[in-house]
Every structure is written in structure tokens, then in C-alpha cells.
Design a protein with these regions (language model features):
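Class I SAM-dependent methyltransferase Rossmann-like catalytic core
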Residues: 1-9
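Class I SAM-dependent methyltransferase SAM/SAH-binding core
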Residues: 30-88
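C-terminal alpha-helical "lid/dimerization" subdomain adjacent to the S-adenosyl-L-methionine
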Residues: 58, 135-175
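A short SAM/SAH-binding and catalytic strip from SAM-dependent methyltransferases
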Residues: 97-110
Length: 175
């Protein structure tokens, strides 16, 4: 979470708020948040009045970290944490009103398979929402973005988390 703030200068929080606005959570909605990590999207979905959230991630450690940060115990009844692969979802057909993935689709090996699984588990009329990085098309910003991405983010990764390579991979995965 700290690294997300540092890497994006806090802008990721604005993106996520807008993402949740577009979701328009309702009490009757069941959300599947893929690559849900520590639960930022899923927990905020509940705080905004969503019904049930299932947070799914391949990384068990991220899910465990997310479970520890829950301060509102009433959410436990409406929250599921599932360690699974987005390319082979362990859910019934047409189970979810919404499926979201934020900053995770670029890490999926077989995107077409994962998108097929998302379609399978979405209810008819359900919505898939994806928040992801993309190329910067404004040339003046592009120069700054490349400098920040190639120099500052790996440096921050090394100083804050002790792992420069993970953040070099992150930048490559965005390209």
C-alpha cells in the first residue's frame, strides 16, 4: 500500500475511488474482485453499500495481509477470501453481479482464458470492470512518465521493500 502511494504519488487512490463510483455498489450486488490482493477494492465496495465481496488472488500472502487489516468485523460475514487462479475460477456459472480486476490483468498469462472465466461467472447483464495502466499518449507527459517509471520506481522499490527486481518487472509488465 505504501509503495502504491509512493509510485503513483497517491493518484492510485483517486483512480480507485472513480472505479468504485462506476461500480455503483448496491446491497444486492455480489462482487468478485480478481487479483484482489489486500482487499482495497473489495473492502471499499462493502463500505459503499455493496452486498457481498469475494476477493480472489493467486498470492496467498497478499490475501493474508488483507484479512489482518479488517477493522470492521461486520464485514467478515459478507467477505470471502479465495486463493485461486483467475484462469480457472472455482465458482459456479453466473454467480456474480460484478467482476473487477485492478492493476492485475497485465500479470495474467492466458488473458483470453481468464476473460472467458470472467464471462462464465458473471450473471447475465452483469458487469466486468478493469482498472489497468496504459501507455501515455501525451508526448510531454510520456517523457516524465518514462523517467519516473524506469528510474524512480525501481529506486523506491529497492529502498522501501528491498526488492528492486519486482519493481523493474512491474514497469516491464506495463509496457
Amino acid at each position: 500500500d505504501l509503495m502504491n502511494d509512493l509510485m503513483s504519488l497517491g493518484i492510485h487512490r483517486i483512480w480507485k475511488e472513480q472505479f468504485l463510483d462506476w461500480m455503483a455498489p448496491r446491497e444486492t450486488h455480489h462482487l468478485l474482485d480478481l487479483a484482489g490482493g489486500t482487499g482495497d477494492i473489495g473492502l471499499n465496495f462493502l463500505k459503499r453499500g455493496g452486498g457481498i465481496t469475494t476477493i480472489a488472488d493467486l498470492n496467498f500472502k497478499m490475501l493474508s495481509t488483507g484479512q489482518k487489516k479488517i477493522t470492521n468485523k461486520k464485514f467478515n460475514q459478507r467477505l470471502n477470501w479465495i486463493n485461486c487462479n483467475g484462469e480457472k475460477l472455482p465458482f459456479n456459472d453466473e454467480e456474480f453481479d460484478l467482476v473487477s480486476i485492478s492493476f492485475g490483468l497485465r500479470n495474467v498469462t492466458e488473458k483470453d482464458v481468464a476473460l472467458g472465466e470472467i464471462y462464465r461467472v458473471l450473471k447475465k447483464g452483469g458487469r466486468f470492470m478493469c482498472l489497468e495502466f496504459s501507455k501515455v499518449n501525451i508526448s510531454s507527459l510520456s517523457v516524465l512518465y518514462r523517467f519516473w517509471s524506469n528510474n524512480v520506481i525501481p529506486f523506491l522499490g529497492e529502498k522501501v521493500s528491498g526488492n528492486r527486481k519486482n519493481y523493474e518487472y512491474l514497469i516491464e509488465s506495463i509496457k
